[in-house]
Amino acid sequence: MAVCKSFQVLYQFLLLFIFIGSVISSLKDVTSSVGLAGHDLGSLAAFGDFDADKKADLFFICNNVMNGKGKVDVYLWNSDRDEFEASSATITLDQVNITNVIPGDFDSDGHLDALVSYHNKTLLSYKDQTFVKVFFGKDSHFELNKVVELPDALKDQPAIVDFNGDLQPDILGDKASDGNRYWWKYNPQNNSYAKELVVSAVNILPLSIPQSSAFLDVSGDYIPDMVLTTKNASSNLIQYEVWINKDGVLTTNEKQIYSQPDSAAVIGQSTFADIDSDGRTDHILPVCVDKLCTKSEIHVHSSTSNKWRTILTNENSQGYKWSFIQDTVGYGIPLMTIRIGDYDMDGYPDAAMVVDITNNNAKDSKRKVVLLENVKCASGATCYNGRTFSMNIDSVFSSVEYPVIVGFFDIYDDGVLDIMAVSFDSAAETYKNHAIRNIIYSDTCFLKVIVLGGSCDNDCPGGIKPYGVNQAGPFVKYITTGLHGDTKVASATQLSQAAYFALQPPYIVFGLGRTPNFVEELIVGLPRSQTSPVRDHTWTSIIPNSQIIIIPFPPDDPGAWKSLLLITPSRLVMLTGGALLATCVFIAMLVGVLHW
């Protein structure tokens, strides 16, 4: 017993000695080298593995104001050349203004499809109605002869949820003609959508425009719930409806509804993340205290305390002042949007956003991309459960003039989150897309998780592996042990939001910091229906620096779910093995000396 304890102490000491230090990284503009420079692509709108090669691809929207055509183009990642290339997967619509594209497997055949929302420019007041078409993918193209249109016009862009827990994405929105809230389910028998009215015991308010509703677990039971962004027309206040999945049925009540922060005059798009890494999801909201956004703040709503807390304010900035931009530009892109990703890989989710920056010695402001590093804090007005944001203005973003979008994406599939940005030329009404590589110099660990759909495994139509289904809502949580013996927990939801250029990648990347230990537990939870059991499963002893693909088939038998582990070797793994080997040699020598 004493020898075992000595072995454990020595091993942990060697690991601490080897891996002590801070995370060092730099950013590099790689727009040209990945094939995105010099092309009039329109705006980056979504990610998805369209050709099912386990490499995520890019979806672009381009609206031509001259000929009235709207296009969606898919650029595929070429692993041999390390660049994105044009494909034959193209959607073209006449006399429309495309507002969004949402990749997903809408007919559950294992192929990635595309939901396209648009305004019909032939109609008077065309911006008051949003139309939806779903284009079904097959191999590396869209089946243009098998297009299904939503029979009803919506008031705004739809949200994607799994309302009935059948693991097939449903469409949620307010119908334009009567203003009521419905959800639409796809029927493969007649290739059509049928609607059902959303009913509740409480008064249902209209969804806000723009809306930022989400499909994710907020109750802590690993089953996805819904958080819907609504607006009270009489008070002009934003309210958030929380719909909890109880025995396979999504329900809400008055206690599950909360309002915007009292001090807020302007409300931005909601974002959700486990900010303090406690395994529970937090609601993150950019707000302006005044109508001009001269005082801007980021608030966090805790599901445990049911209160808003401030995590960042633009007061007391050193040498400059930042402020949110409340305008919506171009294709209807809300600028008050925060996108989440652990870019420094320390185990705490960071953020990126577009803001106006005014230097103290200048009168005019300049729009810039900024990064928000999630750092430790002891106390203070902007300290939320021991965490706060520290703003980072990197010079690499100087090439991104007049930015409108910024988000995180693993370009090179190496487990490190890079940065994608879009800038807008208002005079020419054209977009430029930018790729920024995130180079981590210190040996940090990661865990990349992709959860597939549960409709098929080896028997998918056409024999395809369902790697590109963009399953919305799976909840993922890990538990591991840090260098100091402390328990580390974090959680995230795959593709929790889709409307208004949410730009979420079709996977989850957890930074593990400089912790080379095995991930002790990985828990994955899926939506539940009324007739299904609880759908969650736990995997143990996951190797760090690996990508794990979860195949939840059959969905109602979690014990039979499969996992595919792809390891990304690094110096960290070798050093971990070296520490273990050195410990074993030391113990062997000690035993030998004592024996002789």
Predicted stretch roles:
Residues 52-63, 108-118, 165-174, 220-229, ...:
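Acidic/hydrophobic-patterned starts of short beta strands in beta-sheet-rich repeat architectures
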Residues 34-64:
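Beta-strand-rich domains and repeat architectures in extracellular enzymes and scaffolds
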Residues 80-162, 167, 171-173:
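A generic tandem-repeat structural signature
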Residues 46-52, 103-108, 160-165, 214-220, ...:
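Structural signature of eukaryotic scaffold interfaces centered on beta-propeller domains
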Residues 378-404, 412-417, 421-596:
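Gly/Ser/Thr/Pro-enriched helix-cap/hinge segments flanking short amphipathic alpha-helices
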Residues 6-25:
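Cleavable N-terminal signal peptides of Sec/SRP-targeted secreted and luminal proteins
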Residues 21-30, 67-89, 122-146, 179-198, ...:
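Beta-propeller blade repeat segments, especially FG-GAP/WD-type strand-to-loop junctions
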Residues 33-46, 90-102, 147-159, 201-214, ...:
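Repeat-based blade/solenoid architectures
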